[in-house]
Amino acid sequence: MQLTRCCFVFLVQGSLYLVICGQEDGPPGSEDPEHDDHEGQPRPRVPRKRGHISPKSRPLANSTLLGLLAPPGEVWGILGQPPNRPKQSPLPSTKVKKIFGWGDFYSNIKTVALNLLVTGKIVDHGNGTFSVHFRHNATGQGNISISLVPPSKAVEFHQEQQIFIEAKASKIFNCRMEWEKVERGRRTSLCTHDPAKICSRDHAQSSATWSCSQPFKIVCVYIAFYSTDYRLVQKVCPDYNYHSDTPYYPSG
């Protein structure tokens, strides 16, 4: 019987070491230790330095073996202790949103008497205030008016009432000038009516920044341009559904 037990142990040891770790010692008294000491030929023994595991660590070894044999989804069910992973809170989304960028809003007007380029940027700070930035580059003569209006403002020509309309529309917002810079000079270029001649025209370049508060969600830019040979009225509104988390429903 001792030879059969030794063969079984070596066979199992050669195939899987974890099975040996999970084996329990025989019950006390099953073999007589004094009888073994008096044997003439010593019995080959398995080294206990590698194979012996204390009773406290046996469940861990058995669980490791079960974990190798069980599907991945049942490993924590066998161990009985699900992992306590801390829930990661989602990162807070920033409230600052760019309504208009320098490349999103621009107006380029070219006439015989004027060459005008206006670019703008509007940034919503998410706390009821927003910043307005405009750049103006004009060569020639002409009158242009740039204002911030709600989406309900009609696009129409009222040259004789332009001053009244702009004064009324300016009360919709509470704005204050943050920064302004204006540069004026003269620029020479080929005449439009006769390219063989050189004409000198007025050149103006300005930049301005306002800080405003909005009583409504949508902020539109209203441009009105008047000259001797050209008139233009334009209203530009951002895509609110793209910049906002909630859809916009127009009213009024």
UniProtKB/Swiss-Prot annotation:
Give glycosylation sites per the record: N62, N127, N137, N143
Q: Which organism is it from?
A: Rattus norvegicus
Tissue specificity statement from the Swiss-Prot or TrEMBL entry = Brain. Detected in several other tissues.
Give the start-end ranges of region Disordered: 27-59
- UniProt region (IV (linker domain)), positions on chain: 158-166
* Leader sequence segment: 1-22
Cellular component (GO) terms are: extracellular region
Q: Where is this region: III?
A: 76-157
Modified after translation how?
Answer: May be proteolytically processed at the boundary between the N-terminal non-conserved and the central conserved domain in neuron-like cells.
Q: Which domain of life is it from?
A: Eukaryota
Q: What does this gene product do? A: May be signaling molecules that resemble neuropeptides. Ligand for alpha-neurexins.
What terms describe the molecular function in GO for this protein? signaling receptor binding
Q: Does the keyword Signal apply?
A: yes
Q: What is this protein called?
A: Neurexophilin-3
Q: Where in the cell is it found?
A: Secreted
Compositionally biased, Basic residues: which spans?
45-55
Protein's UniProt keywords contain Calcium = no
Q: Which parts of the chain are coiled coil?
A: none
Q: Which UniProt keywords apply?
A: Glycoprotein, Secreted, Signal
Q: Which Pfam families match?
A: Neurexophilin
